[in-house]
């Protein structure tokens, strides 16, 4: 037990979290040097006299490597995004609020709630005591960064940062270009294996093995997150669904325009919790990658700038880009549960 607690303290230390990204950069530098000098220059340029192929491969690999580092830097600089401070919702009717006197009354900074919001079994929205703010849908408080992250995905030890709504697209681009460059390394060396027999430096075979390992790790990672985006899921949501030990009940409070009441709907572990899937793969992808197809492949700080909206007493102005929209199909499913009287409680508006 003491050993596990000591290990936890070490792995959570900021310097330890920098160690793996630092080692990753060193391996990348070694791989680029071994490929460009030991393979391209010594094997292709000097031994095979393939000057065009040598220069072309060096330019492509160096360009992709610098692009990967640029994306990495953007992920660190931008961060995962921070949910704006959301004041308490006004869920109790004014007629039920009692004040002792006008002199002792506390100024009311509460705002009208949205039509749907995550809550507890009594209909109260989730409060983050660290950020002194309500936590909206898909938002989780991260101890790594010290604030609530909208559309929290996971903490990546390899790049050393938390992934959320703001830098998730960059992470997908990072894994895509990393897969691309290691594929180029593998294919280029594999096609020359027979000709290099007995003449190649050990560094060439080392970088080939390194590229194979990188592809085995980054390839499935990229495809997994493409799958998640196609169905509008995050890593933490998939873990909660698949891991029964971490599964928990979900509660949403929804306004029913038919009778003017708010209803608290419960979703148990194992029950359908596909809240955000819009039913169309392209629509789901656009929610993560944006509407501009070209920006899916071109990383830019401009396309990742987050807007919190204007300061206002209106929830949608406050939440800005962090607002998560539940699918129409699931909204209808919740209304159907209300009609079947499958709700926890009802609130007067």
From Swiss-Prot:
The chain crosses the membrane at residues 19-39, 57-77, 170-190, 204-224. GO terms for cellular component: endoplasmic reticulum; Golgi apparatus; membrane. One of its GO terms (biological process) is protein targeting to membrane. Keywords: Acyltransferase, Lipoprotein, Membrane, Palmitate, Transferase, Transmembrane, Transmembrane helix. InterPro entries: Palmitoyltrfase_DHHC (IPR001594), PFA4/ZDH16/20/ERF2-like (IPR039859). The DHHC domain is required for palmitoyltransferase activity. It comes from Kluyveromyces lactis (strain ATCC 8585 / CBS 2359 / DSM 70799 / NBRC 1267 / NRRL Y-1140 / WM37). Belongs to the DHHC palmitoyltransferase family. PFA5 subfamily. This is Palmitoyltransferase PFA5.
């Amino acid at each position: 037990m003491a050993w596990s607690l000591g290990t936890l303290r070490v792995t959570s230390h900021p310097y330890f979290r920098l160690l793996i990204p630092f080692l990753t950069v060193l391996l990348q530098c070694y791989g680029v040097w071994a490929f460009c000098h030991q393979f391209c220059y010594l094997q292709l340029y000097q031994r095979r006299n393939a000057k065009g192929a040598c220069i072309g491969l060096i330019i492509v690999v160096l360009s992709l490597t610098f692009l990967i580092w640029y994306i990495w830097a953007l992920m660190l600089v931008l961060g995962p995004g921070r949910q704006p401070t959301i004041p308490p919702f006004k869920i109790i009717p004014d007629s039920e609020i009692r004040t002792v006197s006008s002199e002792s009354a506390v100024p009311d900074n509460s705002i009208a709630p949205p039509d749907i919001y995550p809550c507890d079994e009594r209909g109260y929205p989730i409060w983050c005591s660290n950020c002194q703010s309500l936590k909206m849908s898909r938002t989780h408080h991260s101890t790594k960064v010290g604030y609530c992250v909208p559309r929290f995905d996971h903490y990546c030890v390899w790049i050393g940062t938390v992934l959320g709504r703001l830098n998730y697209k960059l992470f997908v681009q990072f894994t895509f270009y990393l897969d691309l460059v290691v594929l180029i390394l593998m294919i280029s060396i594999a096609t020359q294996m027979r000709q290099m027999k007995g003449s190649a430096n050990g560094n060439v075979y080392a970088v080939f093995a390194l590229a194979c390992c990188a592809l085995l790790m980054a390839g499935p990672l990229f495809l997994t997150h493409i799958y998640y985006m196609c169905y509008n899921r995050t890593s933490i949501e998939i873990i909660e669904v698949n891991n029964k030990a971490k599964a928990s009940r979900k509660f949403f409070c929804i306004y029913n325009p038919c009778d003017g009441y708010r209803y608290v709907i419960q979703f148990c572990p194992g029950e359908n919790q596909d809240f955000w899937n819009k039913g169309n793969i392209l629509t789901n992808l656009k929610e993560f990658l944006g509407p501009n197809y070209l920006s899916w492949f071109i990383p830019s700080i401009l396309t990742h700038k987050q807007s919190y909206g204007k300061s206002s007493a209106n929830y949608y102005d406050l939440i800005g880009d962090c607002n998560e929209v539940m699918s129409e199909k699931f909204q209808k499913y919740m209304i159907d549960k209300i009609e079947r009287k499958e709700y926890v409680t009802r609130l007067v508006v």
